[in-house]
């Protein structure tokens, strides 16, 4: 069973992603983090295969803050893949930071808000 933790700013988007992943992936368990402050603890407790976090231009979802969470999760949770989710239509600079993090091996994958549900689920399933 693939375990996935979602750390998404909007509860509506998080629950939509949860439902979509449960429909698209055969065997997965999705946990929604209550807040960025709780994500590291959720990862320690649930030992996920994937941590998906959205990245925004404001706190507490800023790129730097997400990388700090990634660092803590990497130290405490073996084999957890980190995927960043970014709205590629609104902030080109932020999108480039996320791309660069992938190039440097800091994250395992990234997704744009404009991708299809099938592609979204396939990327999460493939890491």
What are these regions (language model features)?
Residues 44-46, 71-79, 104:
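Conserved phosphotransfer cores of two-component systems
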Residues 7-9:
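Conserved acidic carboxylate
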Residues 11-36:
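Two-component/phosphorelay signaling modules centered on CheY-like receiver
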Residues 51, 82, 109-110:
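Two-component signal transduction core modules
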Residues 34-50, 58-60:
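Acidic, metal-coordinating helix/loop segments flanking the phosphotransfer/catalytic sites
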Residues 51-76, 86-97:
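Conserved phosphotransfer microenvironments
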Residues 112-124:
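C-terminal output helix
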Residues 97-108:
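As written
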């Amino acid at each position: 069973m693939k375990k996935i933790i979602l750390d998404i700013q909007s509860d509506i988007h998080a629950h939509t992603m949860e439902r979509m992943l449960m429909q698209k992936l055969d065997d997965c368990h999705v946990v929604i983090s209550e807040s960025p402050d709780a994500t590291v603890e959720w990862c320690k407790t649930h030992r996920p295969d994937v941590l998906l976090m959205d990245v925004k231009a404001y706190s507490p979802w800023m790129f730097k803050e997400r990388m700090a969470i990634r660092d803590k999760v990497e130290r405490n949770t073996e084999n957890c893949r980190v995927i960043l989710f970014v709205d590629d239509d609104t902030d080109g600079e932020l999108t480039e930071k996320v791309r660069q993090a992938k190039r440097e091996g800091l994250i395992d994958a990234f997704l744009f808000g404009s991708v299809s549900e099938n592609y979204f689920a396939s990327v999460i399933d493939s890491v």
